[in-house]
Amino acid sequence: MVSAGHAGATKSDNFCPICGGNEFAEYRGRPRCSCAKCGSKERHRFMALVLRSKLVPKNIGLPVYHFAPEPSIGGVLLELFGDNYQPADLVPDTYAWSTVPVEQVDLRRPLDVFEPGSVGGFIHSHVLEHIPASIDRVVRDMNAALAPGGFHIFQVPVHKGWYREDMDPDMDQSERTRLFHQWDHMRQFGDRDFEERVLELFVGMERIDLSGVLDSDQLRRAAIPPSAITRHTGHTVYAYRKPSLKDDH
């Protein structure tokens, strides 16, 4: 928890949708980025707005998996989904803070972990760039694991340029950082071909239109750049729903 005395924090008319705080500080050159009360950044607050909206079903009755769980979003999900909330990670021991036991899940082969149609929802933020496996297979297998009516909500870092990846296990960490901005990233998502390279993996899923409940003014109040809803950015939330059986009739 970050205290209200967070260095550089200033009060404003902004409002954190996670904790209700109204003091925000600069972070990595981004003004009003970090909530002084809960430590949330722009992408966490945007995710919270989407999760709390009426667009996301809350009574699906199946496990809702949250990968690489962040404390701020984990609290929101536990509030919304109760016993159906399931945090998960490849290395669960790193989440000693979690009040819900974190399940060990390897996302390289999702259908080795999840039965088709057994999951109510997947939520993850800045996770797909880390997975040393075909991104096409990972996403499509996750979608296959969703039950009808289930949802898949995610964020990824988006950079200028084109998609590229290199999963060579022998690549030097400094070279990987140079190419992909972090030593454990396998790929970079680019704004030039994001629609074709990533969103087309969701063929057969319904894209949830966030503009119906969220607009640029709401984002500004939550100290989120309005570009997050108009462009592909690292803060942007992508939300999809698997058609229910009745939708097919």
Question: Which residue stretches match the model-derived regions?
Answer:
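Conserved N-terminal segment of class I S-adenosyl-L-methionine
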Residues: 1-117, 215, 230-236, 243-249
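Activation segment
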Residues: 94, 111, 131-132, 162
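A conserved beta-strand element that flanks and buttresses the S-adenosyl-L-methionine
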Residues: 123
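Short catalytic micro-motifs in class I SAM-dependent methyltransferases
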Residues: 126-130
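S-adenosyl-L-methionine-dependent methyltransferase catalytic module, highlighting the catalytic core
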Residues: 133-249
